[in-house]
């Protein structure tokens, strides 16, 4: 299985131990862990990093822009399931600039081609308006709505 994806905009590779300090900005931008990070940055990073790297059913990727800046993280969670779940975090410096939509279109098509997944599940906290807007743009199909919005994307994407 290919471990890296490169395009005109992104360099994406599996997360490595060398990324831990870089992931401070990712932990800060993460919707739930970011709240802990704001109070106790070192503990927030430690908990975030451990939760991300110790789960054998996740594949985590570091996303870099071509200038070398860390853009964020994308992940497949529950890879042992028929339909894995998507996680995406864009660092605050780059939020709201269209990177999330472009990243997901490129990366999810690569995931479809290299891993054979044709559907990705998504859970969004109903108060996370930024994520809701992103997945509306991507035409995510809503399966059910509660305080969590459960939806999915069919792959490949257009």
Region roles according to the model:
Residues 1-49, 157-158:
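A short, well-structured alpha-helix characteristic of acyl/acetyltransferase catalytic modules
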Residues 15, 90, 124:
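Hydrophobic adenine-recognition pocket in adenosine-nucleotide-binding enzymes
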Residues 34-85, 91, 156:
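Acetyl-CoA-dependent GNAT
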Residues 83, 113-124:
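Conserved GNAT acetyl-CoA-binding A-motif
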Residues 91-93, 97, 126-127:
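Active-site acidic-Proline motif in GNAT/NAT acetyltransferases
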Residues 94, 98-106:
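Conserved acetyl-CoA pyrophosphate-binding loop and the N-cap/start of the following alpha-helix
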Residues 101, 126-144:
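Conserved active-site alpha-helix within GNAT-family acetyltransferase domains
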Residues 141-158:
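C-terminal "cap" of GNAT-fold acetyltransferases
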